[in-house]
Amino acid sequence: MARIETRTEPMVLNMGPHHPSMHGVLRLIVTLDGEDVVDCEPVIGYLHRGMEKIAENRTTVMYVPYVSRWDYAAGMFNEAVTVNAPEKLAGVAVPKRASYIRVIMLELNRIANHLLWFGPFLADVGAQTPFFYQFREREMIYDLWEAATGYRMVNNNYFRVGGVAADLPYGWVDKCLEFCDYFLPVVDEYEKLVTNNPIFRRRIEGIGTISREEAINWGLSGPMLRASGVKWDLRKVDHYESYDDFDWDVQWETAGDCLARYTVRMREMRESVKIIKQAIKGLPGGPYENLEAKRLIAGKKSEWDAFDYQYIGKKVSPTFKMPKGEIYARVESGKGELGIYLIGDDNVFPWRWKIRPADFNNLQILPHLLRGMKVADIVVILGSIDVIMGSVDR
Protein backbone atom coordinates (compact mmCIF):
# COMPACT_ATOMS: atom_id res chain seq x y z
CA MET A 1 0.00 0.00 0.00
CA ALA A 2 1.40 3.40 -1.02
CA ARG A 3 2.27 5.76 1.82
CA ILE A 4 0.31 9.03 1.84
CA GLU A 5 2.57 12.07 1.82
CA THR A 6 1.83 14.57 4.58
CA ARG A 7 2.61 18.27 4.41
CA THR A 8 5.38 19.26 6.76
CA GLU A 9 6.02 22.87 5.72
CA PRO A 10 4.22 25.68 7.62
CA MET A 11 0.89 26.90 6.30
CA VAL A 12 0.19 30.61 5.87
CA LEU A 13 -3.37 31.62 6.76
CA ASN A 14 -5.08 34.99 6.26
CA MET A 15 -7.54 35.99 8.99
CA GLY A 16 -9.67 39.02 8.14
CA PRO A 17 -10.12 41.80 7.42
CA HIS A 18 -13.39 41.54 9.32
CA HIS A 19 -16.46 43.71 9.54
CA PRO A 20 -15.99 46.86 11.70
CA SER A 21 -18.76 45.71 14.08
CA MET A 22 -16.48 42.96 15.39
CA HIS A 23 -12.78 43.77 15.84
CA GLY A 24 -12.62 45.93 12.78
CA VAL A 25 -10.82 45.67 9.47
CA LEU A 26 -7.69 44.01 10.86
CA ARG A 27 -5.85 41.42 8.78
CA LEU A 28 -3.65 38.81 10.44
CA ILE A 29 -1.17 36.82 8.33
CA VAL A 30 -0.73 33.77 10.53
CA THR A 31 1.93 31.09 9.95
CA LEU A 32 0.83 27.71 11.31
CA ASP A 33 2.54 24.43 12.04
CA GLY A 34 -0.46 22.18 12.36
CA GLU A 35 -2.57 23.78 15.10
CA ASP A 36 0.32 25.79 16.54
CA VAL A 37 0.94 29.43 15.68
CA VAL A 38 4.53 29.95 14.51
CA ASP A 39 4.24 33.63 13.62
CA CYS A 40 1.66 36.38 13.18
CA GLU A 41 1.91 39.60 11.19
CA PRO A 42 -0.87 42.16 11.74
CA VAL A 43 -1.70 44.30 8.69
CA ILE A 44 -3.33 47.60 9.60
CA GLY A 45 -4.29 50.78 7.78
CA TYR A 46 -7.57 49.79 6.12
CA LEU A 47 -9.45 52.48 8.09
CA HIS A 48 -6.89 55.26 7.79
CA ARG A 49 -8.64 58.59 7.18
CA GLY A 50 -5.92 61.13 7.90
CA MET A 51 -7.40 62.32 11.19
CA GLU A 52 -4.21 64.09 12.28
CA LYS A 53 -3.94 66.07 9.04
CA ILE A 54 -7.63 66.97 9.21
CA ALA A 55 -7.05 68.35 12.73
CA GLU A 56 -4.22 70.54 11.44
CA ASN A 57 -6.60 72.14 8.93
CA ARG A 58 -9.51 72.76 11.32
CA THR A 59 -10.11 74.97 14.33
CA THR A 60 -10.79 73.16 17.59
CA VAL A 61 -14.50 74.05 17.40
CA MET A 62 -14.70 72.65 13.85
CA TYR A 63 -12.75 69.49 14.70
CA VAL A 64 -14.76 68.20 17.69
CA PRO A 65 -17.49 66.52 15.52
CA TYR A 66 -14.80 64.56 13.64
CA VAL A 67 -13.18 62.89 16.63
CA SER A 68 -15.94 60.39 17.42
CA ARG A 69 -14.69 58.45 14.41
CA TRP A 70 -11.33 57.56 15.96
CA ASP A 71 -12.70 55.06 18.44
CA TYR A 72 -16.36 54.83 17.56
CA ALA A 73 -17.12 52.93 20.79
CA ALA A 74 -15.70 55.74 22.94
CA GLY A 75 -16.61 59.05 21.34
CA MET A 76 -16.77 60.99 24.62
CA PHE A 77 -13.14 60.16 25.46
CA ASN A 78 -12.05 61.40 22.05
CA GLU A 79 -13.93 64.65 22.60
CA ALA A 80 -12.51 65.02 26.12
CA VAL A 81 -8.88 64.79 25.05
CA THR A 82 -9.57 67.00 22.01
CA VAL A 83 -10.70 69.87 24.24
CA ASN A 84 -8.34 69.12 27.14
CA ALA A 85 -5.22 69.70 25.03
CA PRO A 86 -6.10 73.29 23.94
CA GLU A 87 -7.41 74.04 27.46
CA LYS A 88 -4.11 72.93 28.96
CA LEU A 89 -2.05 74.86 26.40
CA ALA A 90 -4.05 78.09 26.71
CA GLY A 91 -4.79 77.84 30.44
CA VAL A 92 -8.57 77.83 29.95
CA ALA A 93 -10.46 77.19 33.20
CA VAL A 94 -13.46 74.86 33.27
CA PRO A 95 -16.36 75.45 35.71
CA LYS A 96 -16.83 72.81 38.36
CA ARG A 97 -20.33 72.02 37.15
CA ALA A 98 -19.15 71.43 33.58
CA SER A 99 -16.30 69.27 34.89
CA TYR A 100 -18.73 67.09 36.88
CA ILE A 101 -20.97 66.72 33.82
CA ARG A 102 -17.91 65.67 31.80
CA VAL A 103 -17.05 63.02 34.40
CA ILE A 104 -20.59 61.62 34.27
CA MET A 105 -20.47 61.39 30.46
CA LEU A 106 -17.00 59.82 30.45
CA GLU A 107 -17.97 57.14 32.95
CA LEU A 108 -21.16 56.33 31.03
CA ASN A 109 -18.94 55.93 27.98
CA ARG A 110 -16.57 53.66 29.92
CA ILE A 111 -19.50 51.38 30.76
CA ALA A 112 -20.70 51.44 27.13
CA ASN A 113 -17.16 50.67 25.91
CA HIS A 114 -16.74 47.72 28.26
CA LEU A 115 -20.17 46.37 27.32
CA LEU A 116 -19.29 46.51 23.63
CA TRP A 117 -16.07 44.68 24.46
CA PHE A 118 -17.89 42.12 26.63
CA GLY A 119 -20.38 41.00 23.97
CA PRO A 120 -18.00 40.28 21.06
CA PHE A 121 -15.39 38.79 23.43
CA LEU A 122 -17.93 36.26 24.68
CA ALA A 123 -18.96 35.60 21.06
CA ASP A 124 -15.29 34.94 20.22
CA VAL A 125 -15.13 32.38 23.03
CA GLY A 126 -18.33 30.74 21.80
CA ALA A 127 -21.04 32.20 24.07
CA GLN A 128 -23.52 33.95 21.79
CA THR A 129 -26.24 34.93 24.27
CA PRO A 130 -24.42 37.71 26.22
CA PHE A 131 -23.63 39.39 22.89
CA PHE A 132 -27.33 40.23 22.57
CA TYR A 133 -27.84 40.97 26.27
CA GLN A 134 -25.34 43.83 26.38
CA PHE A 135 -27.22 45.85 23.74
CA ARG A 136 -30.07 46.22 26.24
CA GLU A 137 -27.91 48.22 28.66
CA ARG A 138 -26.12 50.14 25.90
CA GLU A 139 -29.51 51.25 24.60
CA MET A 140 -30.23 52.86 27.97
CA ILE A 141 -26.94 54.76 27.84
CA TYR A 142 -27.75 55.85 24.27
CA ASP A 143 -31.08 57.22 25.50
CA LEU A 144 -29.31 59.25 28.19
CA TRP A 145 -26.83 60.62 25.65
CA GLU A 146 -29.60 61.42 23.20
CA ALA A 147 -31.48 63.41 25.85
CA ALA A 148 -28.37 65.40 26.84
CA THR A 149 -26.53 65.81 23.53
CA GLY A 150 -29.07 65.14 20.77
CA TYR A 151 -27.23 62.11 19.41
CA ARG A 152 -26.84 58.50 20.46
CA MET A 153 -23.64 56.58 19.83
CA VAL A 154 -21.12 58.81 18.05
CA ASN A 155 -21.08 62.45 16.99
CA ASN A 156 -22.35 63.62 20.36
CA ASN A 157 -20.38 66.85 19.79
CA TYR A 158 -20.95 67.71 23.45
CA PHE A 159 -17.57 68.77 24.82
CA ARG A 160 -16.31 72.31 24.24
CA VAL A 161 -13.08 74.13 25.05
CA GLY A 162 -14.00 75.66 28.41
CA GLY A 163 -17.01 73.50 29.25
CA VAL A 164 -19.81 71.53 27.62
CA ALA A 165 -22.31 72.43 24.91
CA ALA A 166 -25.43 72.51 27.11
CA ASP A 167 -26.62 71.75 30.61
CA LEU A 168 -28.26 68.46 31.54
CA PRO A 169 -31.96 68.68 30.61
CA TYR A 170 -34.92 68.55 32.98
CA GLY A 171 -35.25 65.13 34.66
CA TRP A 172 -31.97 63.78 33.23
CA VAL A 173 -30.29 63.31 36.61
CA ASP A 174 -33.16 61.13 37.89
CA LYS A 175 -33.06 58.96 34.76
CA CYS A 176 -29.30 58.52 35.13
CA LEU A 177 -29.67 57.45 38.77
CA GLU A 178 -32.36 54.97 37.72
CA PHE A 179 -29.94 53.48 35.21
CA CYS A 180 -27.20 53.19 37.88
CA ASP A 181 -29.55 51.38 40.29
CA TYR A 182 -30.67 49.06 37.50
CA PHE A 183 -27.20 48.35 36.13
CA LEU A 184 -25.36 47.01 39.21
CA PRO A 185 -27.56 43.88 39.53
CA VAL A 186 -27.15 43.38 35.77
CA VAL A 187 -23.35 43.18 36.15
CA ASP A 188 -23.92 40.57 38.88
CA GLU A 189 -26.17 38.69 36.45
CA TYR A 190 -23.44 38.76 33.79
CA GLU A 191 -20.87 37.48 36.28
CA LYS A 192 -23.20 34.72 37.44
CA LEU A 193 -23.87 33.73 33.84
CA VAL A 194 -20.29 33.82 32.58
CA THR A 195 -17.45 34.10 35.10
CA ASN A 196 -17.57 30.65 36.68
CA ASN A 197 -18.74 28.82 33.58
CA PRO A 198 -16.25 25.91 33.28
CA ILE A 199 -16.05 26.10 29.46
CA PHE A 200 -15.43 29.86 29.58
CA ARG A 201 -12.73 29.45 32.26
CA ARG A 202 -10.91 26.76 30.28
CA ARG A 203 -10.92 28.94 27.17
CA ILE A 204 -9.40 32.05 28.81
CA GLU A 205 -7.60 31.09 32.03
CA GLY A 206 -3.82 31.05 31.59
CA ILE A 207 -4.12 32.16 27.94
CA GLY A 208 -2.24 35.20 26.60
CA THR A 209 -0.28 35.84 29.78
CA ILE A 210 1.64 39.13 30.01
CA SER A 211 4.08 39.66 32.88
CA ARG A 212 4.39 42.96 34.73
CA GLU A 213 7.76 43.70 33.06
CA GLU A 214 6.45 42.88 29.59
CA ALA A 215 3.40 45.10 30.07
CA ILE A 216 5.61 48.06 31.02
CA ASN A 217 8.22 47.43 28.31
CA TRP A 218 5.61 47.12 25.55
CA GLY A 219 4.00 50.41 26.60
CA LEU A 220 0.61 48.88 27.39
CA SER A 221 -2.08 50.88 29.16
CA GLY A 222 -5.58 50.56 30.54
CA PRO A 223 -6.97 47.14 31.55
CA MET A 224 -4.12 45.47 29.62
CA LEU A 225 -1.61 47.07 32.01
CA ARG A 226 -3.65 46.81 35.20
CA ALA A 227 -4.38 43.10 34.60
CA SER A 228 -0.61 42.47 34.72
CA GLY A 229 -0.12 43.84 38.23
CA VAL A 230 0.54 47.53 37.49
CA LYS A 231 -1.79 49.77 39.49
CA TRP A 232 -1.77 52.67 37.01
CA ASP A 233 -4.85 54.72 36.15
CA LEU A 234 -4.54 58.23 34.69
CA ARG A 235 -7.63 59.36 36.58
CA LYS A 236 -5.59 58.93 39.78
CA VAL A 237 -2.17 59.80 38.32
CA ASP A 238 -2.97 62.97 36.34
CA HIS A 239 -5.82 64.31 38.52
CA TYR A 240 -7.67 65.63 35.46
CA GLU A 241 -11.28 66.83 35.50
CA SER A 242 -12.75 66.33 39.02
CA TYR A 243 -11.84 62.70 39.69
CA ASP A 244 -10.06 63.62 42.94
CA ASP A 245 -13.43 64.67 44.39
CA PHE A 246 -14.74 61.10 44.30
CA ASP A 247 -14.06 57.97 46.33
CA TRP A 248 -13.24 55.06 44.03
CA ASP A 249 -10.60 52.35 43.63
CA VAL A 250 -8.28 51.36 40.79
CA GLN A 251 -9.12 47.81 39.75
CA TRP A 252 -6.16 45.54 38.99
CA GLU A 253 -5.10 41.90 38.84
CA THR A 254 -1.76 40.10 38.87
CA ALA A 255 -2.29 37.04 36.65
CA GLY A 256 -1.91 38.96 33.36
CA ASP A 257 -4.00 36.48 31.34
CA CYS A 258 -7.27 36.88 29.44
CA LEU A 259 -9.26 36.10 32.59
CA ALA A 260 -7.49 38.89 34.49
CA ARG A 261 -8.29 41.39 31.73
CA TYR A 262 -11.92 40.25 31.78
CA THR A 263 -12.08 40.63 35.58
CA VAL A 264 -10.59 44.14 35.55
CA ARG A 265 -13.12 45.38 33.00
CA MET A 266 -16.10 43.88 34.82
CA ARG A 267 -15.03 45.50 38.09
CA GLU A 268 -14.37 48.83 36.36
CA MET A 269 -18.02 49.00 35.31
CA ARG A 270 -19.01 48.85 38.97
CA GLU A 271 -16.50 51.58 39.83
CA SER A 272 -17.90 53.75 37.03
CA VAL A 273 -21.39 53.48 38.53
CA LYS A 274 -19.93 54.48 41.90
CA ILE A 275 -18.30 57.58 40.36
CA ILE A 276 -21.46 58.58 38.45
CA LYS A 277 -23.59 58.38 41.61
CA GLN A 278 -21.14 60.56 43.55
CA ALA A 279 -20.87 63.08 40.69
CA ILE A 280 -24.65 63.41 40.47
CA LYS A 281 -24.98 63.76 44.24
CA GLY A 282 -22.28 66.46 44.39
CA LEU A 283 -23.16 68.22 41.12
CA PRO A 284 -22.59 71.96 41.80
CA GLY A 285 -25.99 73.64 41.74
CA GLY A 286 -27.82 70.32 41.72
CA PRO A 287 -30.07 69.12 38.88
CA TYR A 288 -30.88 71.62 36.16
CA GLU A 289 -34.40 72.27 37.44
CA ASN A 290 -33.11 73.07 40.98
CA LEU A 291 -30.37 75.32 39.61
CA GLU A 292 -32.81 77.38 37.57
CA ALA A 293 -35.16 77.77 40.56
CA LYS A 294 -32.30 78.92 42.82
CA ARG A 295 -31.17 81.46 40.24
CA LEU A 296 -34.69 82.81 39.85
CA ILE A 297 -35.27 83.20 43.59
CA ALA A 298 -31.91 84.85 44.34
CA GLY A 299 -31.86 87.16 41.33
CA LYS A 300 -28.82 88.51 39.50
CA LYS A 301 -26.54 88.55 42.56
CA SER A 302 -27.05 84.84 43.20
CA GLU A 303 -24.00 82.67 43.85
CA TRP A 304 -25.54 80.30 41.32
CA ASP A 305 -24.43 82.66 38.57
CA ALA A 306 -20.83 82.30 39.73
CA PHE A 307 -18.21 80.62 37.56
CA ASP A 308 -18.40 77.28 39.38
CA TYR A 309 -22.07 76.91 38.54
CA GLN A 310 -22.09 78.13 34.95
CA TYR A 311 -23.09 75.02 33.09
CA ILE A 312 -21.56 75.94 29.75
CA GLY A 313 -18.47 77.65 31.11
CA LYS A 314 -16.36 80.27 29.38
CA LYS A 315 -16.70 78.80 25.91
CA VAL A 316 -14.06 80.13 23.56
CA SER A 317 -14.83 81.97 20.33
CA PRO A 318 -14.66 80.22 16.93
CA THR A 319 -11.49 82.23 16.22
CA PHE A 320 -9.75 80.98 19.38
CA LYS A 321 -5.99 80.97 18.75
CA MET A 322 -3.73 78.36 20.28
CA PRO A 323 -0.74 80.07 21.90
CA LYS A 324 2.81 79.15 20.97
CA GLY A 325 4.01 76.10 22.83
CA GLU A 326 3.64 72.36 23.05
CA ILE A 327 1.63 70.17 25.36
CA TYR A 328 0.78 66.51 25.87
CA ALA A 329 -2.71 65.88 27.24
CA ARG A 330 -4.06 62.43 28.04
CA VAL A 331 -7.14 60.76 29.49
CA GLU A 332 -7.87 57.24 30.71
CA SER A 333 -10.24 55.87 28.08
CA GLY A 334 -11.92 52.48 28.29
CA LYS A 335 -8.98 50.97 26.40
CA GLY A 336 -6.11 52.83 28.09
CA GLU A 337 -4.10 55.99 27.63
CA LEU A 338 -5.55 58.22 24.92
CA GLY A 339 -3.24 61.18 24.36
CA ILE A 340 -2.79 64.25 22.18
CA TYR A 341 0.57 65.88 21.49
CA LEU A 342 -0.26 69.42 20.44
CA ILE A 343 2.01 72.15 19.09
CA GLY A 344 0.46 75.60 18.80
CA ASP A 345 1.97 78.55 16.90
CA ASP A 346 -0.41 81.41 17.75
CA ASN A 347 -2.85 80.36 15.06
CA VAL A 348 -6.45 79.13 14.91
CA PHE A 349 -5.12 75.84 13.48
CA PRO A 350 -2.72 73.61 15.43
CA TRP A 351 0.75 73.30 13.91
CA ARG A 352 0.94 69.62 14.93
CA TRP A 353 -1.76 67.32 16.26
CA LYS A 354 -0.44 63.86 17.15
CA ILE A 355 -2.91 61.24 18.36
CA ARG A 356 -1.69 58.52 20.72
CA PRO A 357 -4.46 55.87 20.76
CA ALA A 358 -4.42 53.20 23.45
CA ASP A 359 -5.38 50.24 21.29
CA PHE A 360 -2.71 50.97 18.64
CA ASN A 361 -0.02 50.48 21.28
CA ASN A 362 -1.79 47.56 22.93
CA LEU A 363 -2.15 45.76 19.58
CA GLN A 364 1.64 45.67 19.08
CA ILE A 365 2.05 42.85 21.60
CA LEU A 366 -0.32 40.52 19.69
CA PRO A 367 2.34 38.63 17.62
CA HIS A 368 4.39 38.12 20.80
CA LEU A 369 1.38 36.65 22.60
CA LEU A 370 0.28 34.38 19.74
CA ARG A 371 3.57 32.58 19.09
CA GLY A 372 3.31 29.04 20.41
CA MET A 373 -0.45 29.24 21.01
CA LYS A 374 -3.20 27.25 19.26
CA VAL A 375 -5.32 28.54 16.36
CA ALA A 376 -8.42 28.58 18.59
CA ASP A 377 -6.66 30.98 20.99
CA ILE A 378 -6.08 33.68 18.34
CA VAL A 379 -9.55 35.24 18.55
CA VAL A 380 -9.60 34.90 22.35
CA ILE A 381 -6.32 36.80 22.81
CA LEU A 382 -7.23 39.41 20.18
CA GLY A 383 -10.63 39.89 21.82
CA SER A 384 -9.08 40.37 25.26
CA ILE A 385 -6.95 43.27 23.96
CA ASP A 386 -10.06 45.28 22.92
CA VAL A 387 -9.17 47.05 19.69
CA ILE A 388 -11.26 49.36 17.52
CA MET A 389 -9.60 49.78 14.14
CA GLY A 390 -10.89 53.31 13.60
CA SER A 391 -8.69 54.30 16.52
CA VAL A 392 -5.73 52.13 15.49
CA ASP A 393 -5.65 53.42 11.89
CA ARG A 394 -6.92 56.98 12.52
From Swiss-Prot:
Enzymatic reactions: a plastoquinone + NADH + (n+1) H(+)(in) = a plastoquinol + NAD(+) + n H(+)(out); a plastoquinone + NADPH + (n+1) H(+)(in) = a plastoquinol + NADP(+) + n H(+)(out)
EC number: 7.1.1.-
Subcellular location field: Cellular thylakoid membrane
Protein's membrane topology: Peripheral membrane protein
One record GO biological process: photosynthesis, light reaction
Functional summary from the UniProt entry: NDH-1 shuttles electrons from an unknown electron donor, via FMN and iron-sulfur (Fe-S) centers, to quinones in the respiratory and/or the photosynthetic chain. The immediate electron acceptor for the enzyme in this species is believed to be plastoquinone. Couples the redox reaction to proton translocation, and thus conserves the redox energy in a proton gradient. Cyanobacterial NDH-1 also plays a role in inorganic carbon-concentration.
Name of this protein: NAD(P)H-quinone oxidoreductase subunit H
Organism: Trichormus variabilis (strain ATCC 29413 / PCC 7937) (Anabaena variabilis)
Phylogenetic placement of the source organism: Bacteria, Bacillati, Cyanobacteriota, Cyanophyceae, Nostocales
Gene designation: ndhH
